[in-house]
Amino acid sequence: MKNILDMFRFLIWIFQAIYYLRRYHIDIVFCKGGYVALPVVLAAKLLGKPIYVHESDTRPWLVNRIASKFAKHIYTGFSKVLPWAKVVWQLLSDELVVNTDWLEKSSQTNILLMGWSQWAMTLYSAILELLPALESENFHFTVILGKLNTQLKSDFETFSNVEVREFCSQKELWALYMRSDIAITRAGTTSLAEQDLFDLKLIMVPIPRTHDQFANAKRYVEQRDGILLDQDSPDFKAKLLAELLKLKNFKKTITQKDIKTAILEPKKQILSDMIG
């Protein structure tokens, strides 16, 4: 019964999408994926409107696999993801570009720890256990907890080489990327692309049982010399400590890339195809 109801809801969503596409005179539909995008894509197909698809992940999700069959142009953030796709890299926020004059140079190795979600407790707890062994090293940690892990704030603040933040705006995060040398991070495509843009050494700890994050991380191991760790491994903490100690004197080499151009170029390519 539920499947029948879902089918009727889906048909209603398609008709609603047709209504809004006509009402607002939409000429082009751009799809980034997600379940709610599929009715809009199918409505656009029925109305004969051009569809453009961008897939961020190394493994395309179902909606984008379907949408790509109707698309006029297909774009990806990685190679060998979808047939006939143009690789344009990731689509990142323009807010990542801000003034850097105020940033202070540091002789320490700056490590940015980002877990964000409720699934990050294992990652944060592992770092807390390792911090006593790392406090005497030349490390400075910036820990972004996210709103779901604020109970750990006081634990992190007991260490002199740790700065704790509950939340960061996009511009604040950009400044932290600029200052940091290493990121201990999950393996979502947007986060990895942002951190790679700022030349951070990536220690990637994918959310367990998320095959897309493991696939994303493997690409960065192959192409960017990243480090991939499995938090479900029994020796996860020992491996993480060993990797950090190897990098205790690491300072990133900032390339001469124009960050603003790197962010704008994929968008310019897509816009050129749309109006060309």
Which residues does each PLM region occupy?
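Donor-nucleotide binding loops and adjacent catalytic segments primarily
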Residues: 105-182, 192, 214, 218, ...
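Active-site-proximal region of nucleotide-activated glycan assembly enzymes
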Residues: 46-99, 103
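Short His-centered aromatic/hydrophobic patch
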Residues: 32-36
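Structural loop-to-beta junction motif characteristic of Rossmann-like glycosyltransferase folds
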Residues: 49-50, 181-182, 199-207, 225
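C-terminal "capping" alpha-helix adjacent to the active site of nucleotide-linked donor transferases
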Residues: 222-251
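An amphipathic, basic-hydrophobic alpha-helix
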Residues: 2-28, 46
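C-terminal alpha-helical cap of glycosyltransferases
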Residues: 242-249, 260-276
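Acidic donor-binding loop of glycosyltransferase active sites
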Residues: 26-28, 178-191, 200
